[in-house]
Amino acid sequence: MPVNLPEIVPASLTPIQGIRLGWAESNIKTQNRKDLLVIEICDGSAVSGVFTQNRFCAAPVTLCKKHLDAVKNNATTGGNVSGIKALVVNTGNANAGTGEQGMLDALTTCQHLAEIMAIPVESILPFSTGVILEHLPMDKLLAGLPLAVTNLTTDNWADAASAIMTTDIAPKAYATQVKVGGESINITGISKGAGMIHPNMATMLGYVATDANITQSLLDSMTKEIADLSFNCISVDGDTSTNDSFIVIATGKSNAVAITSPNDKGYQEVFDALLETSQYLAKAIVRDGEGATKFITVTVKGALSIDEAKTIGFSIGKSPLVKTAMFASDPNLGRVLAAIGYASRECDSLADLDTNQLELYFGGLLVAEKGGRAASYKEDEGQAIMNEAEIDITVQLHRGNEESTIWTCDFSYDYVKINAEYRT
């Protein structure tokens, strides 16, 4: 079961003015389950996306980028595509590694939805998640589109969270609200993911919507920064997927003042609320990591750069030896120290890391310093911390002022079982 992940309360997921969501059971991979989602976006909205860095990216990712570029080019040249009007998401099939046919299938999906909704093809962003190297069952997917559009309502966020799940055990959603100049701004989001999770995006999908009025260029920069502080700070297994996507939508329907620059009133409040939502959704993916029994926070302080800190954090967080020790509730200091030591392979500036200066903490307990076990450390105290479902690991490098936090989970027997049986 997920590690301390609260169950979704549908009534708590605030509808976002200008957004409607609809789902269908298309039987793409599994019978009688939600597996197709359409999100309708009102005119005048700003939409921004961040996508996988995997060079083997899926066809829908390529088409998403193309359609976003078409919208941005239209804004400067004038044309018929005035903005993104809809998102369409299917689960059960990633449409990755499917060549020209995969691109044609992604485009055909957009064409059929465009006809149903009477909107331009280029105004639709397609997303797929599931098994790689299998072609989409287009007859099933296309048959589901009219049903999903018929189901469009403003309060479908909980069902939408369920409709994008694959190996997830639990749906993931979050909502919050801030006040700017006495006016409310709402933020609601959903995410999916449980395995093949590592930064630069992973096999995760995240969709966050707000009724704030944010210019397109500012939303683009905010989305990138928020992704770097949330979805790019998680790891379940160290694998980066072909399909990951993070989309932020600002409908502009709130009565609050427009936000056009980081210096504007309300910018920080809205940024913080978007970040809060995104970090919750990112951590929810880790809490629901395939077979996870522990949620682990790794904080690295005293680095020369954020890159140094994040590199060490992920070196610890994606180490199979560290993760299996966490599953066993084994306070194995050596495995953590070893992971710190080989982090220099990924970050050249760590080549001169003085291991005699660093300190390692489990929770608030000093467990290693001066190149070895702390003199005050007692194994039973470390064991007590490892027995907890949530574990904090802190590394103090004492070489600078930068820090970074990442979130990961343990490796259990079930992780192997889930992935060994994934295609069967």
UniProtKB/Swiss-Prot annotation:
Record pathway: Amino-acid biosynthesis; L-arginine biosynthesis; L-ornithine and N-acetyl-L-glutamate from L-glutamate and N(2)-acetyl-L-ornithine (cyclic): step 1/1; Amino-acid biosynthesis; L-arginine biosynthesis; N(2)-acetyl-L-ornithine from L-glutamate: step 1/4
InterPro entries: Arg_biosynth_ArgJ, ArgJ-like_dom_sf, ArgJ_beta_C
Catalytic center residues: T203 (nucleophile)
Gene Ontology terms for molecular function: glutamate N-acetyltransferase activity; L-glutamate N-acetyltransferase activity
Signal peptide region: none
Function, in words: Catalyzes two activities which are involved in the cyclic version of arginine biosynthesis: the synthesis of N-acetylglutamate from glutamate and acetyl-CoA as the acetyl donor, and of ornithine by transacetylation between N(2)-acetylornithine and glutamate.
Protein name: Arginine biosynthesis bifunctional protein ArgJ
Organism: Colwellia psychrerythraea (strain 34H / ATCC BAA-681) (Vibrio psychroerythus)
UniProt gene name: argJ
